[in-house]
Amino acid sequence: MFLFPAIDLKDGACVRLKLGLMEESTVFNTDPGAQARDFAAAGAEWIHVVDLNGAFAGKPVNGAAVDSILKSVSVPVQLGGGIREMATIEDWLARGIRRVILGTVALKNPALVKEACQRFPGRVAVGIDAKGGKVAVEGWAETSDLTVLELARKFEDCGVAALIYTDIDRDGVLAGPNVAATAALADAISIPVIASGGVSSLVDLKALKAYPKLEGVISGRAIYDGRIDVAQAIALLKA
């Protein structure tokens, strides 16, 4: 199982949000490239990056910060936030992003996801963010009537590399991940699932590791708060 240390970008800096609220952000590092280097030095095999401004704007905003991350590390980077068009997907992959994460567009234009998977095999992930079990989009500002499983099943046979499942009600509050919902989703679909939201300790990582269908786990605030040591977490997940 992989650990995906998270870099959430707002106005060019590494921040963490609480419950997905932009006004509830805390700056942890003003140099995203340096943060990425720290993660790579600790043994991270992937880095998870989100363009928060982009998620709300519907187009990339923190391009310079993402480029600084790509220049700073050789480990693969997956990126989400504001990726809504094929031209944007092409651009990010050409710039060195290993895997793009499609969120809002997966709900609003699933055909684009399927086309991207055909054109870029293994380089397209779907991000499903849930609030009360229902899919949330537009930077979590809007909730749909679709359940997580209903949306996930739309992409079962089109070659999606991974499904990143975030429980917004737990994100950035260190309340522990929604292990039951995440495990149930992983059991119900054939796409590898990456858990996100609420991870607060090595105990939480152990709980998720018990489910072999999970490909990995994303952690942000717990790392920045010093509750999780990246090297220790990787050793635990690899053991």
Swiss-Prot record:
EC number assigned by the record: 5.3.1.16
One example of a Gene Ontology biological process annotation: L-histidine biosynthetic process
Alphabetically ordered keywords of this record: Amino-acid biosynthesis, Cytoplasm, Histidine biosynthesis, Isomerase
Gene Ontology MF terms in the entry: 1-(5-phosphoribosyl)-5-[(5-phosphoribosylamino)methylideneamino]imidazole-4-carboxamide isomerase activity
Compartments, record wording: Cytoplasm
PANTHER family according to UniProt: 1-(5-PHOSPHORIBOSYL)-5-[(5-PHOSPHORIBOSYLAMINO)METHYLIDENEAMINO] IMIDAZOLE-4-CARBOXAMIDE ISOMERASE
Transmembrane intervals: none
Originating organism: Paramagnetospirillum magneticum (strain ATCC 700264 / AMB-1) (Magnetospirillum magneticum)
Active-site residues from the entry: 8 (proton acceptor), 129 (proton donor)
Protein name: 1-(5-phosphoribosyl)-5-[(5-phosphoribosylamino)methylideneamino] imidazole-4-carboxamide isomerase
Pathway membership, UniProt: Amino-acid biosynthesis; L-histidine biosynthesis; L-histidine from 5-phospho-alpha-D-ribose 1-diphosphate: step 4/9
Gene: hisA
Enzyme class: isomerase
Similarity section: Belongs to the HisA/HisF family.
GO cellular component annotations of the record: cytoplasm
Highest taxon above the source species: Bacteria
Record field: catalytic activity: 1-(5-phospho-beta-D-ribosyl)-5-[(5-phospho-beta-D-ribosylamino)methylideneamino]imidazole-4-carboxamide = 5-[(5-phospho-1-deoxy-D-ribulos-1-ylimino)methylamino]-1-(5-phospho-beta-D-ribosyl)imidazole-4-carboxamide
Record-linked Pfam families: His_biosynth (PF00977)
